[in-house]
Amino acid sequence: MFFYLSKKIAVPNNVKLKCISWNKDQGFIACGGEDGLLKVLRLETQTDDSKLRGLAAPSNLSMNQNLEGHSGAVQVVTWNEQYQKLTTSDQNGLIIVWMLYKGSWYEEMINNRNKSVVRSMSWNADGQKICIVYEDGAVIVGSVDGNRIWGKDLKGIQLCHVTWSADSKILLFGMANGEIHIYDNQGNFIMKMKLNCLVNVTGAISIAGIHWYHGTEGYVEPDCPCLAICFDNGRCQIMRHENDQNPVLIDTGMYVVGIQWNHIGSVLAVAGSQKVVTQDKDINIVQFYTPFGEHLGTLKVPGKQMCSLSWEGGGLKIALAVDSFIYFANIRPDYKWGYCSNTVVYAYTRPDRPEYCVVFWDTKNSEKYVKYVKSLISITTCGDFCILATKADENHPQEENEMETFGATFVLVLCNSIGTPLDPKYIDLVPLFVAMTKTHVIAASKEAFYTWQYRVAKKLTALEINQITRSRKEGRERIYHVDDVPSGSVDGVFDYSKAIQGTRDPICAITASDKTLIVGRESGVIQRYSFPNVALIQKYSLDCRACQLSLNCNSSRLAIIDIAGVLTFFDLDTRVTDSTGQQVVGELLKLERKDVWDMKWAKDNPDLFAMMEKTRMYVFRNLDPEEPIQTSGYICNFEDLEIKSVLLDEILKDPEHPSKDYIMNFEIRSLRDSRALIEKVGIEDASQFIEDNPHPRLWRLLAEAALQKLDLYTAQQAFVRCKDYQGIKFVKLLGNLQSESMKQAEVIAYFGRFEDAERMYQDMDRRDLAIGLRMKLGDWFRVLQLLKTGSGDADDSLLEQANNAIGEYFADRQKWQNAVQYYVKGRNQERLAECYYMLEDYEGLETLANSLPENHKLLPEIAQMFVRVGMCEQAVSAFLKCNQPKAAVDTCVHLNQWNKAVELAKSHSMKEIGSLLARYASHLLEKNKTLDAIELYRKASYFFDAAKLMYKIADEEAKKRTKPLRVKKLYVLSALLIEQYHEQMKNAQRGKVKGKNSEATSALAGLLEEEVLSTTSRFTDNAWRGAEAYHFFILAQRQLYEGYVDTALKTALHLRDYEDIIPSVEIYSLLALCACASRAFGTCSKAFIKLESLETLSAEQKQQYEDLALEIFTKHTPKDNRKSELNSLLEGGEGKLPTCIATGSPIIEYQFWVCKVCKHYVLAQEISNYNFCPLCHSSVE
């Protein structure tokens, strides 16, 4: 960080100033002094010249108003920035609130206690409240509209300072005796503050300043110290909060008059005076510190006595009240920034996030990439890469085998130019100073430095990635103590214990090139090492403490900027004789410049460099300066006689919207002179000048000028001198052209004036060349336009190419509908298929598939598209069209179209369908999805397997004994599947014997085949038994409830044949009930005998049946009244009559109806009452 005095404003009549305050938002400067002096000034930057921005732009006083109202010396001035108010107070205790009206300041409110003098006033963070403290201990808190909120008298206490906390909940009162008391916002005392900085201090002390940064622009680090308290004896403490037990302690070694944080709380300015040992007087100085107590530098200020200081709102200037003058100093902050491959990388803090926001701004394409990085320490760049040095996250997993003794507390993150992290390296060394070359990163703490040979992904092989630990042993990572004398051997040990060994002479700066590493130490010693094999070559001794070091492109000279901003140069290899007559290596060059805050060597010339001195940029060639350029930019790059600089001050005013206007390009004098010579004198003289001052950029400039004049000889010579092979080829191409106008057109195109070149081609009637030019540029819209507008027929292949290229243009931007139109014209079926798919236009995709010839290479892709969206039929069609039946079957299986899969497998004689079905069915059964498995088998025409599973479900449901109708339906479904199985077997056999004797023969053979297979299951022979059992069971009960007791008994008697399906107890209980109702007590008696003999019943249940039987048969004789009618049912046997499935009665007539599906009978007179079979519910025809 550098600072220098830039402006001085005198107060009329030599009136001594007492206080100064700079409004952070609007830029007004209020200063108060003796005899009631109160002035409001405003410095405004002139922006007439767009090149001059920021600090480099001239500034004038746009306001200089004297405010009349105070009679005594004005001692306190404070701004309310939110409400544009100024509050001032004088030695008589008079307080005036001023307001801005039509560009001038006017009194708004006046208050005078007439008892005591105001010592301090402070507005809270949102500008709603002001706290005023008087010397006699009175405290008043008022609102912005002038109303008093509360007041308090602190008896026996002299107050001198007050400040609010960021959340307005705490007030700190500074006492005249040096104590600080903490109060809440209602004026209740909480506690005294512990002042660690005053330990062992004796004598009277007073508070010089209290400033609590409110975090309005974010914090440089989470939990960052922000409350600064400083005493007149120079002791200072910076606290994280009012109860911080471990504050940062500073002894400034000066008499302090005031302190203030900058706008983001990153720099604390401490103003006062210091005794000079050599002179018997005090000098005014401002010292700058970080929130962690690190000293950033000292600014010396002329004059007798400084009384106050105030920062500008952007932190780029500071105003100092000294005697009767206001001095302004410019600040050049140490921004965290870098420049790599057209990308400016910069970091800033935001109030809404604890991390740093790191922006990678591609200045070429105006694209921005943002990363959030916790505890960022620095940004270092080189080539196409950058290193972000940060503190390690405490809970972040470290690399395997990374740290054995020490926990890695810092990370070096290698990123590319868009912020993608490529390789993080965890180290246990504070990276205070980081340098980077094309192959290495060097990080240094105060005691040691670490080197890491980084590699980027394109160079890494899989083998190398797996050898991280070994590569470390081979020397990719090394660590050296600054006091060591390394020999350059690679057998050193990677040992972090070196990093914690102390040194009396700490490191203060480092720099490196591909072959040299320079380490600067606080004593002024410069150590030079060979690189990358680190060996100490030389030690040099200088009389300054380096702050910034830089090597030129051939590592022969070192530029040093010290902490006072003095730039010197050291020649590393020159041998000179010192004062003792000894020959030494290295010489300090005579050039010395003051107030320098940035410098950059040219990448391609060891004698060229650019430096920033105050608000001027100087370019030096062989230590001779060119005329300065007014700018305040930070130098990004110096190459090809051009300097690129970036106005970081302007960018960071609005970091989210960087503008290309803030990138400045400057040409050095030799480039400007060469251009002027070429334009005004001619190519020959310019050629001679460039010969005397050779540089590839100048030769290129000459070559381009010669090309424009078609001086091909000079152009070729110049291209040879700047080693531009493409340029040489282009000149040869021009030499082969006959027409001058053709040459001219080619040159115009070479310089990028494509519209003019095209016009010339068309004027020459060479539409083909115009089209060729546009094709090279990739301007296919114009190509298409030229093809269509020509008089002759357009080339079909070119038209297709243009249409396809435009299709690609739209497809890249995901404008699929537009792309389709051009792909259709370009007959690009592959891309057309993709567009249809992205548009979900499956009809178009199907039409495309149908239009393709068989075995076209695109068909499998289209089929896969259909598969992905579940369109089985279209996918199968496409697969079959390209002769991939296996893929078609797999698709059917994948989409659960098993019947289609079986059909395909059969038609293409594929054997694996059975195993596929079995595998999928077992998967469904494992998940207890039996019905899904049945459906699967049924769809695949595996009726027998489906029937087995359905029969199993019916059996399980029957065991529940709840819903007999549901059980009947399940048995019916099972039987129907068996019937379909029988039919399938017959049809299969018919197919086998086709062409044999007769249809009867084939039917018989089918039955025989079926008979063999049907022995595999007990239910295949009589599939309808279960359905019959539950049909009669339900029918009997329905008939009984409807009062047809005789019919119910006949039906119930059938149930005796189904004891294997329905429990005997239910059958005989129903039979006994029906027989009793029908007064067939003989049948009833037999049913009771059967019930009493059942072994499944408990003794208690048997007893209940016996009691019931006793009750019935004591009243009725166990004989059937109508025995003759029941004979046929009771006897059974071979001559058993068929049963009517509708009534349960035996069929004795010759005419009856037979169901075609289940083969059961119904009485002829009964069937007229039914539309469907009573058992299987098939249609009655």
UniProtKB/Swiss-Prot annotation:
List the InterPro entries hit by this protein, alphabetically: Beta-prop_WDR35_2nd (IPR056158), Beta-prop_WDR35_TULP_N (IPR056159), Ift122/121 (IPR039857), TPR_IFT80_172_dom (IPR056157), WD40/YVTN_repeat-like_dom_sf (IPR015943), WD40_repeat_dom_sf (IPR036322), WD40_rpt (IPR001680), WDR35 (IPR017233)
Q: Name one Pfam family in it.
A: Beta-prop_WDR35_2nd
Q: Which SUPFAM superfamilies match?
A: DPP6 N-terminal domain-like, WD40 repeat-like
The alphabetized list of GO BP terms reads:
cellular response to leukemia inhibitory factor; cilium assembly; intraciliary retrograde transport; protein localization to cilium
Cellular component GO terms, alphabetically?
A: axoneme; centrosome; ciliary basal body; cilium; intraciliary transport particle A
Can you say where in the cell this protein is located?
Cytoplasm, Cytoskeleton, Microtubule organizing center, Centrosome; Cytoplasm, Cytoskeleton, Cilium axoneme; Cytoplasm, Cytoskeleton, Cilium basal body
Give residue ranges of the WD repeats: 12-51, 69-108, 113-152, 154-193, 502-539
* PANTHER family reported for this sequence: LD29485P, WD REPEAT DOMAIN-RELATED
How is this protein named in the record?
WD repeat-containing protein 35
Organism source for this protein?
A: Mus musculus (Mouse)
What would be the name of the gene that encodes this protein? Wdr35
